[in-house]
């Protein structure tokens, strides 16, 4: 697998998987990446070296400028907003799943069912290449 890393300053990268919001990272001077089904189920994996580690899901990165480089303000605000755009995706403790892409699950079906409402977002993001 390969993963495209880029350098961004004072921007948040939001990874979308299967049409739903997945994870948000703030990049300050180094390349960082995480691919998560959605926030509560897969923790962030920060990487300083391109190509390190694995990508578990095919995602597209959406780049949004942020006002502050402080993770406590920027990340929490964007992550909270992003997750709540898709109702029904709240995590339940112990519901972690390691299913590979393409394997149907109730959680993924629910995520796909809400895709149209997410894709009509009023903030047009900049699409970056897919990670495979």
Curated annotation (Swiss-Prot):
Residues 115-125 have a biased composition (Low complexity). One of its GO terms (cellular component) is extracellular region. Keywords: Secreted, Signal. Residues 91-132 are annotated as: Disordered. Residues 1-35 form the signal peptide. It comes from the Eukaryota. The keyword Secreted applies. It is found in: Secreted. This is Putative uncharacterized protein ENSP00000381830.
């Amino acid at each position: 697998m390969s993963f495209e890393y880029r350098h961004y300053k004072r921007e948040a990268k939001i990874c979308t998987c299967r049409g739903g919001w997945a994870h948000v990272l703030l990049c300050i001077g180094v390349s960082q990446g995480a691919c998560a089904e959605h926030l509560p189920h897969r923790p962030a994996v920060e990487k300083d070296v391109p190509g390190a580690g694995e990508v578990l899901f095919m995602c597209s990165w959406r780049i949004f400028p942020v006002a502050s480089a402080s993770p406590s303000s920027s990340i929490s605000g964007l992550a909270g907003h992003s997750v709540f755009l898709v109702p029904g995706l709240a995590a339940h403790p112990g519901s972690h799943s390691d299913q590979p892409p393409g394997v149907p699950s109730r959680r993924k079906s629910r995520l796909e069912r809400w895709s149209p409402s997410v894709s009509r977002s009023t903030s047009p993001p900049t699409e970056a290449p897919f990670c495979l």
